Every structure is written in C-alpha cells, then in structure tokens.
Amino acid sequence: MQKRVRNRLITIIICFCSACLGISIILYNLEKNIVFFLPPSKINAIEQGKELRVGGLVKTDSINKIADDKISFVITDNIKDFEILYQGALPALFRKGQGIIAIGQLSNGKFIARQLLAKHDENYRPPQ
C-alpha cells in the first residue's frame, strides 16, 4: 500500500511540474507578442530614453507631413493629447480617428516613435 501511494504522489508531482513548466514557456512567449500600452492621460513623467508604448486615437487635423517619410501627429484619449514624431512607412490603416499604438521613447521633450501599430475592430478587411 505504501509503495502505491508513493508512486501516485510521484506521478502527481511530475504532472504538476510539467504543467508549471509548460505554462511558464507559454507565458514567456506571449510576453514578447502581446502589446500593452499607456493612454496619454496615464503618462506623467517619462524618463528620457526609456522605451514606452503609447496608444490612443489619431486626433482630427493633427497629421503634419514634415518630409517624404517623416510625420508628426497627435494622439488623444479624449482626456489628454500627446504629440508623436514618426519616420518610416505608415501602416495601411493609419488615418484620423484611427486607434494607434506608438512604440518609441522620449527625446528632448518629444516622443519619437520607431514603430506604429494600427488597431482595428473585429471586422478587419485588408485594403484592396
């Protein structure tokens, strides 16, 4: 009887450890792919050079083309506005009123985005 209980306990411990290891691997890989962001109203004092994800809606009439591939625009969460500078190709869904996540850092009082992600609703249809 004692041996049977011991074997069952060992089996349960091995299954538990395997499940914990599997969950840890899944969460570690998800961490790299899930994009969390802060809305403009939650951004207070940002450290210079610290990587940050800022998200909100592109404010109407705030898109300014500075050069061929450089733009500035303002995102808002209807509480606070936040100016963003971006250089590169814009996402296909980028337009006024569209949800955007900007990944970048603060430099000399301006947020310099190195990547823009356009958010869409559940009825996404790629541009034709």
Curated annotation (Swiss-Prot):
- Please name the GO terms of the biological process aspect recorded for this protein, alphabetically: cytochrome complex assembly
Tell me where the transmembrane regions lie.
9-29
Recorded topology in the membrane: Single-pass type II membrane protein
Keywords, sorted A to Z: Cell inner membrane, Cell membrane, Cytochrome c-type biogenesis, Heme, Iron, Membrane, Metal-binding, Signal-anchor, Transmembrane, Transmembrane helix
Periplasmic side stretches: 30-128
Identify the residue ranges that face the Cytoplasmic compartment according to the record: 1-8
Stored InterPro entries:
CcmE, CcmE-like_sf, NA-bd_OB-fold
State the Gene Ontology terms under molecular function.
Answer: heme binding; metal ion binding
Which compartments does it reside in?
A: Cell inner membrane
Q: Which family does it belong to?
A: Belongs to the CcmE/CycJ family.
Query: Per its database record, what is this protein's job?
Result: Heme chaperone required for the biogenesis of c-type cytochromes. Transiently binds heme delivered by CcmC and transfers the heme to apo-cytochromes in a process facilitated by CcmF and CcmH.
Q: What is this protein called?
A: Cytochrome c-type biogenesis protein CcmE
Query: Which organism does this sequence originate in?
Result: Rickettsia peacockii (strain Rustic)
Q: What is the lineage of its organism?
A: Bacteria, Pseudomonadati, Pseudomonadota, Alphaproteobacteria, Rickettsiales
Q: Which gene encodes it?
A: ccmE
